Structures are given as C-alpha cells and as structure tokens.
C-alpha cells in the first residue's frame, strides 16, 4: 500500500511542504490529489470540488509539476507553452506574453526554440514549472520542483512562488531539502511508509528549539548504522 489513511486539510493560501523519506508516499499523494492516480478508497477535494467528480473544473484550478515530468520532447519550450495555451482555450496573444515572461524568468529564452528532449534535467524542470504557471492556477502541486535546478534559477522560482502565494494562491510541494521547506513554508506534512505522521503549521510541528530536520528524524527515525561495517572506507581492511 503506497498511501493509507491520509487525512489532510491544507488551508487555502498556504505554502505547504510535503516531506518524507524515499518511498513514503509523497508522489502518490500528489498524484491522487490532482487526478493522475485514482485512490482505492477516499476522496480528494480541491477548492471545494471533488477531484474525481469535477475533473475538468479541478484541472482548471491546478498547476501541476508531476514526477516523472510530462513533456513532449519533440516540441520546443515555446511551442509547448503555446500548445498548452490552446488546450486551455487561452487568448493567443496573452499566451505569447506570459510565455516570454516565464521563459525569461526561468533563463530559458536562449533555448526556447530548441526541442525539450535535448534539455538538461534542470531545464526540463523549469519548463514544467513555467507550464504549470501559464494559466494562473489557484493551486500549485509541485513534486520536487527544485531538484536539478541551479541555484540562480532556484532563487527566481522561489520568488515567483512567493509572489503567487502573496496573490492568494496555494502552493504544495514535496522536497527532501528540510532547510528549504523550513525557509519557504508555513505548513508542513510529514509522511513515512504511506502514513501521515504529522500535519499542520510549521511552528506547531517543529519541536521547541529544533530544526525541521531534527523533528523529522525524531519522527521517522535515523537510518541504523553499524560501526563494524564499512571499515574499509577508513582504510581498515579487516
């Protein structure tokens, strides 16, 4: 079972970080919320709409960066954004204006007419983030949005997400970078083995005088280490 008994209520307008070890169910949770994966039981609601009853309406409300990324490799970044604009019946001129601004902020302008299939992982991730923002959604669901993104672009992305949130948008993103979540988020969800261990405002989840990483390790447990193993790494051949 990838996820079981997950009961989450993420307030509108919040910046929520979803954290957990590899295989904890973060990606599955995001996929169920956005309608990419149907749960065996239970419901997912976005802005008061059931994801599986009002699928088209929910998709209009969401901007999603899934894992793995869902891009058309034979299209250029500029073509990909134009294609998404047509699918959403957006005004062509507005799509061009927004696309150029997004490509510029993501430092993709010089590569905008190259096929996405030739992009690095970080460039593909930035293209996906631009695509998620294009239609100005109300909620962003981002699976590891900063993975593989260079530090300069990461600062730009954080600035964009802060601006999106300050305008009333809701951001939910998964990450293994505890310091990043602690710096950006006001809410946090801690998962392990498909179960939600804690969820709520960051200030309440984080222990007194502890970092989020300290709290996370105390909840999830540190990986066991046997000092008798891997002695050869220190030059001890046994």
Where are these regions (language model features)?
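Conserved ABC ATPase "signature" region
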Residues: 82, 86, 93-111
């Amino acid at each position: 079972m990838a996820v079981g008994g997950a009961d989450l209520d993420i307030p509108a307008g919040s910046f929520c970080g979803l954290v957990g070890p590899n295989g904890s169910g973060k990606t599955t949770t995001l996929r169920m919320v956005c309608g990419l994966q149907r749960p065996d039981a239970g419901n997912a609601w976005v802005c008061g709409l059931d994801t599986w009853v009002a699928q088209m309406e929910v998709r209009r409300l969401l901007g999603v960066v899934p894992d793995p990324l869902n891009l058309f490799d034979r299209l250029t970044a500029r073509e990909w954004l134009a294609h998404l604009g047509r699918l959403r019946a957006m005004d062509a001129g507005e799509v061009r204006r927004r696309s150029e601004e997004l490509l510029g902020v993501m430092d993709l302008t010089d590569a905008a007419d190259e096929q996405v299939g030739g992009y690095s992982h970080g460039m593909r991730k930035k293209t996906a983030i631009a695509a998620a923002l294009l239609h100005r959604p109300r909620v962003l669901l981002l699976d590891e949005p900063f993975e593989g993104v260079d530090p300069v672009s990461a600062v730009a992305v954080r600035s964009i997400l802060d601006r999106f949130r300050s305008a009333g948008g809701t951001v939910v993103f998964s990450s293994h970078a505890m310091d990043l979540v602690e710096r950006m988020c006001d809410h946090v969800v801690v998962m392990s083995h498909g179960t939600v261990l804690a969820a709520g405002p960051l200030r309440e989840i984080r222990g007194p005088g502890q970092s989020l990483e300290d709290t996370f390790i105390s909840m999830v447990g540190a990986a066991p280490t046997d000092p008798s193993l891997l002695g050869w790494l220190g030059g001890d051949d046994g």
